[in-house]
Amino acid sequence: MKRIAILTSGGDAPGMNAATRAVVRKAIYEGLEVYGINYGFLGLVNGDIRKLELGSVGDLLHRGGTFLYSARYPEFATEEGQLKGIEQLKKHQIDGLVVIGGDGSYHGAEALTKRGFPTIGIPGTIDNDISGTDFTIGFDTALNTVLDALDKIRDTATSHERTFIIEVMGRDAGDIALWSGLAGGAEAIIVPEESFNMDDVVDRLNKGRERGKKHSIIVVAEGVMSGNEFAKQLAEYGDYHARVTVLGHVQRGGSPTAFDRVLASRLGARSVELLLENRGGLAVGIRENRIVENNIGEILKEKHTLDQKLFDLASILSI
């Protein structure tokens, strides 16, 4: 193993730059050459590859986004796309690859591994929806972004004695909604993994009113329905004329938290070690604060599950 490359793919997540920095500096420390691939798998196929030095990743640790850029390239799922990628890697004499991203990125990494090219996956997505790890890079930062907004919305909800609905990201996973809702004291948390009944939500709000509570916060994951649609349905139950805030892509940006920076650094460094050990086809992660690695194919077969105990706790504490 003399040369390795790194790319970021799919939706950006705070901490991707920190992980890239760790891969580059750990690899150079171990005597390897490192190449950065711009625009994910699209850049790989197009040969948009450049050599990275120690200084290339300076002033990156605290920056959100990804300086390697990202792009969606569904064509990489085809044999033609994968063979073009392998051709470019061989052309640049690259021996191993690190891929930072979510589920789709892992599929690309697995495809390369099956074609005999050593590839390591690093979980980088704000959704926290990757199996084999307690946390993904970017989740903690996104969570704190949502919590900051929730706290501020709580101020105005209290001042005007209103119900506010906050729509957060999470098409298939409700971790952002659950964790931010619990941390922010939301009166109701609506996630894709748990069915909900509007009658139950209204009953919870009414009980709060009976105790003298004059405002409430409801956090809705986008995968369930839009915040506006939820507000429309809620209004059918009486004078719940809720205000809606859609946080959108602000959740993806911002300087990564200390937790995400440290997590990204640990996962990035471990990825290089695995390549040096000629152990491709693995995804790194963190379990109970220990860095672990799992077969990337097995990770893709597993379905991420919501923390049921945490969901139940949020329901109890929001009474």
UniProtKB/Swiss-Prot annotation:
Q: Name one GO cellular component term.
A: 6-phosphofructokinase complex
Q: Main site of residence? A: cytoplasm
Q: In which residues is substrate bound?
A: 125-127, 162, 169-171, 222, 243, 249-252
Q: Which GO terms describe its biological process?
A: canonical glycolysis; fructose 1,6-bisphosphate metabolic process; fructose 6-phosphate metabolic process
Q: Which cofactor does it need?
A: Mg(2+)
Q: Where is the active site?
A: 127 (proton acceptor)
MF annotations from Gene Ontology: 6-phosphofructokinase activity; AMP binding; ATP binding; fructose-6-phosphate binding; identical protein binding; metal ion binding; monosaccharide binding
How does its record describe regulation of its activity?
Allosterically activated by ADP and other diphosphonucleosides, and allosterically inhibited by phosphoenolpyruvate.
InterPro entries under this entry? ATP_PFK (IPR022953), ATP_PFK_prok-type (IPR012003), PFKA_ATP_prok (IPR012828), Phosphofructokinase_CS (IPR015912), Phosphofructokinase_dom (IPR000023), PKF_sf (IPR035966)
Q: Name one Pfam family in it.
A: PFK
Which reaction(s) does its UniProt entry say it catalyses? Answer: beta-D-fructose 6-phosphate + ATP = beta-D-fructose 1,6-bisphosphate + ADP + H(+)
* Residues holding Mg(2+): 103
Q: In which pathway does it act?
A: Carbohydrate degradation; glycolysis; D-glyceraldehyde 3-phosphate and glycerone phosphate from D-glucose: step 3/4
- Enzyme Commission no: 2.7.1.11
Report residues binding ADP: 21-25, 154, 185-187, 211, 213-215
UniProt subcellular location? Cytoplasm
Q: Which NCBIfam families match?
A: PFKA_ATP (TIGR02482), PRK03202.1 (NF002872)
Give the quaternary structure: Homotetramer.
- What is the name of this protein? ATP-dependent 6-phosphofructokinase
> What are the leading ranks of the lineage?
Bacteria, Bacillati, Bacillota, Bacilli, Bacillales
